[in-house]
Amino acid sequence: MNPLDLIAKRAYPYETEKRDKTYLALNENPFPFPEDLVDEVFRRLNSDALRIYYDSPDEELIEKILSYLDTDFLSKNNVSVGNGADEIIYVMMLMFDRSVFFPPTYSCYRIFAKAVGAKFLEVPLTKDLRIPEVNVGEGDVVFIPNPNNPTGHVFEREEIERILKTGAFVALDEAYYEFHGESYVDLLKKYENLAVIRTFSKAFSLAAQRVGYVVASEKFIDAYNRVRLPFNVSYVSQMFAKVALDHREIFEERTKFIVEERERMKSALREMGYRITDSRGNFVFVFMEKEEKERLLEHLRTKNVAVRSFREGVRITIGKREENDMILRELEVFK
């Protein structure tokens, strides 16, 4: 078979809808990156640095990430960056023999595994959304989003440690950490077979800049840096991340609003009789049977609203207050 035909058969693109609607499908931050901080980014850019292959990661960015992590056991040799958290995930699938994940989970795990031709194992979460017993070990990388995407619920520390104790490598995807406020990064003191992945896309309103970072043992970071592309995160993107961390209080205040809106929406949805998860992300998840879900999606299409459909239900991103009010009204009418 022609190699291009083989790729077309096994891999498929990540597609999004047009943005000519109320778009609550991709868990983007409803607030734009502050204009005064955009101005600061461009004031701090050195035009001469634009002509060179700029260091990635930038040592100053690594120092700021370490300060943000606020631990006493990590050094610059424990951190690297990626072109979004997605690149880190993609590279890790090249580093290990097999990728393991637990649907419902982040859809890109399967997309990336198929794209790179990786061996992968999907084992569904239990009915109560816990990590199942699974036969894994050295050579496997187990991807666990925490809070989970798309459901938003949180896995217990004991569940993570159960996988770590098998010897499999655990990629703990904390993309939504800021909306939960609790991290298992301290497990790095105990386990070398762990990497914590984070992103600037969600809480810091920088999805378009593509900046993620990974925290792990020095041995893992050394291996990751050998496999990832050189100069993988642009000078400009790294500057945006540095400025964001310099003004983190702005984003913490915005995150507080998003969390309050999430809790308001969860309360309203429960009162309407919807079955939802206890989401700790910047979204809510509503369980629905296929027929009901399809009817809701069609209803929302007539209102020019996009949410994300999954086999188990729908995920709704927390938007601006007026967007949240609107979606609640439509869900009440639909009910």
Curated annotation (Swiss-Prot):
The modification N6-(pyridoxal phosphate)lysine is found at K202. Keywords: Amino-acid biosynthesis, Aminotransferase, Histidine biosynthesis, Pyridoxal phosphate, Transferase. It is an enzyme of class 2 (transferase). Its EC number is 2.6.1.9. Signal peptide: none annotated. Pfam families: Aminotran_1_2 (PF00155). GO terms for biological process: L-histidine biosynthetic process. GO terms for molecular function: histidinol-phosphate transaminase activity; pyridoxal phosphate binding. Pathway: Amino-acid biosynthesis; L-histidine biosynthesis; L-histidine from 5-phospho-alpha-D-ribose 1-diphosphate: step 7/9. InterPro entries: Aminotrans_II_pyridoxalP_BS, Aminotransferase_I/II_large, HisP_aminotrans, HistidinolP_aminotransfase, PyrdxlP-dep_Trfase, PyrdxlP-dep_Trfase_major, PyrdxlP-dep_Trfase_small. Its cofactor is pyridoxal 5'-phosphate. It catalyses: L-histidinol phosphate + 2-oxoglutarate = 3-(imidazol-4-yl)-2-oxopropyl phosphate + L-glutamate. The keyword Transferase applies. It comes from the Bacteria. NCBIfam families: hisC (TIGR01141). Homodimer. Belongs to the class-II pyridoxal-phosphate-dependent aminotransferase family. Histidinol-phosphate aminotransferase subfamily. This is Histidinol-phosphate aminotransferase. It comes from Thermotoga sp. (strain RQ2). The gene is hisC.
